Amino acid sequence: MLKSVQGLWKDFFGIRDDGRKREYGSLDEVRKRSALRSRRKQMRPTGKSVLKRPRKVTDRKTEEKIRTNRRKTPKRRLTKIFQTIRDVFSNDNENMSKMQNVCGDMTRILKKRSQGRPSYMDTDTAKSRILRSDAFKRKISELKYNKQRISELRSGSSDGSSGKDRNQSLYLDREILLQRQIKKRDEKIKALESKLQSLQEALNYSNEKYRILEDLLDSSNIHPSYTKSRRTMSNLARENDEIKPLKIDLSPSPIRRTNSLFTSSPMKTYNRDGNIPEMQPLQENISPACPTPPYRSRETEKEDETLSPISVDFSSYLS
């Protein structure tokens, strides 16, 4: 209590040391420090080699004045005084009782039953719901039927009663199979009905289109014979899919053989197709001034082996 009174006294007269205060020195020292800091920032290189300009340094004296004025406002001083007086006359027992009440409430809240689960999800209600469900009854009937079938297969007795039971089970199997077949047929009928409906709609659309085209043809001044001819042509094309040209086996074009006497090419032999007929050379005079040379066969060319354009008969010189 004595310490709190001393703190109140020091706060009232402004003698108490404030840890937030910091000695910055004189005004000249502060200015020197800010100038050095700005120079260092200018000399520091950057990634893009662009010098950063120093920020505008505010006057430290004005900042200190603002802080001292804020600190010495009467409102803050009054709040401090009231806080110290409250600390002097505060009662710890009251705080402890509040904490105890809060803890007691928490324990009571934790001990309460969780409200998330409804009452119908208890075990008894769940069992009753399962027993009353249709799925459970269906499963039990299937199990009974399976057990009955297994017992019939194992026994294999030829008594009248067993025969009746067997016939009854066969009837049941047939009934199940028939029901499945009926279901499949119904599905097929539905699919065919939907398809028939779509085809009916397409047919109605085509009929309407045909009627509109007929109206357009009637309104236009076209001769009926022309329209009939066009219709017959289109019908023929539809019947034959498309009009294709006739495929006729044409004979291959003959290859004219080159003669070395009349060409500068040294070609002597060539691969000729035997199926292609060889053309006979022209034996007629083009003009009297330029008579055609005598025809020489391939054998004589092979014997002479000459490329000269002038033919010489050496047999006259041998005699």
Swiss-Prot record:
Naturally occurring in which organism (per UniProt): Saccharomyces cerevisiae (strain ATCC 204508 / S288c) (Baker's yeast)
UniProt name for this protein: NAP1-binding protein
Compositionally biased spans, kind Basic residues: 34-43
Keyword Lyase: no
Sites bearing Phosphoserine, chain numbering: 251, 260
Statement: the UniProt record of this protein carries the keyword Phosphoprotein: yes
The protein's assembly and partners: Interacts with NDC1 and MPS2.
Record keywords: Phosphoprotein
GO molecular function: lipid binding
